[in-house]
């Protein structure tokens, strides 16, 4: 089912489709984060990626709970957006020789993924509330809060040291 196809007729259809989209995205990030951690030079950045990997695994489990709570099939649909973000990160990482610049590029890629997730979770929460599913909205809010916290940590790390090293 593609976005804006005939298969999406109701708010509930849209909600379930976006759940499937973010489920796919989170599962792809579970695969990508170890590679990003391996490429990272800065120890704090490397550890941040590994910590977020653990959180992302919990996000996948939480989404599986949300599917069940909502009575929907646990299913992932391809998400070209997250695939593109991950592909671009891989390509850039392969082109950057300077380790400090690579760390800055990795943060940029991670934040692109975070911002995508933040938008998706924000919409899902609003739609869950409209559908009378405050229980589901509450579960999704936990993940949104964690995604925002990760984004803030990445910004702090970039601004306090990574970007400074990359520029020198």
At which residue positions do the language-model features occur?
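Amphipathic alpha-helical hairpins
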Residues: 1-168
């Amino acid at each position: 089912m593609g976005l804006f196809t005939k298969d999406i007729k109701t708010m509930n259809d849209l909600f379930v489709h976006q759940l499937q989209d973010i489920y796919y995205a989170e599962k792809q990030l579970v695969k990508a984060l170890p590679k990003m951690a391996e490429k990272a030079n800065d120890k704090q950045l490397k550890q941040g990626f590994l910590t977020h990997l653990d959180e992302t695994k919990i996000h996948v489990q939480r989404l599986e709970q949300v599917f069940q709570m909502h009575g929907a099939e646990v299913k992932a649909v391809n998400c070209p957006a997250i695939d593109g973000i991950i592909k671009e990160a891989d390509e850039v990482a392969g082109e950057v020789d300077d380790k400090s610049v690579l760390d800055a590029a990795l943060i940029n890629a991670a934040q692109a993924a975070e911002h995508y997730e933040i938008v998706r979770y924000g919409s899902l929460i609003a739609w869950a509330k409209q559908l009378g599913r405050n229980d589901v909205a509450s579960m999704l809010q936990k993940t949104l809060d964690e995604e925002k916290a990760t984004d803030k940590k990445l910004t702090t790390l970039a601004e306090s040291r990574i970007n400074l090293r990359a520029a020198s």
